[in-house]
Regions:
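Radical SAM enzyme core and accessory elements
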Residues: 233, 237-263
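Conserved, mostly hydrophobic/aromatic
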Residues: 187
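Conserved SAM/AdoMet-binding glycine-rich loop
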Residues: 2, 23, 27-104
């Protein structure tokens, strides 16, 4: 599906991370909310600054489920460290591999934790020679791969079962972005999908509630529907997947091969 998105770790600035104090501030802010699961993008570089005991000790103070996204090279290190600590956490892992991974084949994880494994595809060769769940990654020069394997076709729309709840939702909000907040390694806070920072974790009196209120007022991405784009005249605009981060980052707000002028 063209709009599917995953919080995959980035090779760029891979050593950058929130401090343990910043992480504590963020999780403290979530205690009185309805948030149940926190996604954490992790690199072993974090363990060069803090011990695994410090990280696990902090996370265990809260009653959240944690979904950790990391590369396969980092997975065994963190799980081995966690298993040495006599503290139970509600943890699951999304483990990513790509052509640069030292483990070049999919393997079975022997762990007490739930693990999903995904392979990152940068070009058509990555897609053709790998099995399992494959995630296309936009590099800026692989438009042909996205056009062939990711873009929505008219047949995709015609085969879609119309769901009135989804149809109404797509008219009012963007389900890819709505309710999601991103916190970057430098502490800047964004509405998911937005390039505009709303606040920083280090700001005096920082509050995630204020961040949510600000997004509701400014409407950066949470209500970015196809009606707000050049798709606004397309009769399928509320059946298509909502606007995705790929479309925003690539400045291509139309991930399909549908020419509605010819319909």
């Amino acid at each position: 599906i063209a709009a599917t998105q995953h919080p995959c770790p980035s090779y760029e600035d891979s050593a950058a991370s929130l401090t343990l104090d910043q992480l504590r501030i963020l999780i403290d802010n979530l205690k009185l909310t309805s948030v149940a699961t926190i996604d954490i993008i992790f690199s072993n570089n974090f363990l060069e600054r803090y011990s695994c005991e410090e990280l696990v000790g902090l996370l265990s103070k809260y009653n959240f489920a944690y979904r950790v996204h990391l590369y396969s090279e980092d997975y065994e290190t963190i799980v081995t460290s966690i298993n040495k600590i006599d503290i139970k956490l509600n943890l699951s892992f999304i483990v990513y591999q790509d052509r640069f991974s030292s483990n070049d084949k999919f393997y079975t994880f022997n762990s007490a934790y739930n693990c999903d494994q995904k392979y990152l595809a940068y070009d058509e060769q990555d897609i053709m020679f790998n099995m399992g769940v494959i995630l296309p990654v936009w590099t800026g020069n692989n438009q042909e791969m996205f056009s062939k394997y990711v873009y929505t076709e008219l047949s995709d729309i015609e085969e879609t079962k119309i769901n009135l709840n989804a149809l109404f939702r797509n008219k009012k909000l963007n389900s890819n972005f709505y309710g999601l907040i991103d916190i970057a390694p430098d502490g800047n806070v964004y509405a998911h999908g937005s390039k505009k920072s709303i606040a920083n974790v280090n700001d005096k009196g920082f509050s995630l509630v204020d961040v949510v209120i600000d997004e509701f007022k400014k409407n950066r991405t949470w209500r970015l529907t196809r009606d707000c784009t050049k798709c606004k005249l397309c009769p399928y605009r509320f059946v298509c997947p909502p606007v995705s981060i790929f479309e925003i980052q690539s400045n291509q707000i139309k991930m399909c091969h549908i020419n509605y002028n010819e319909l």
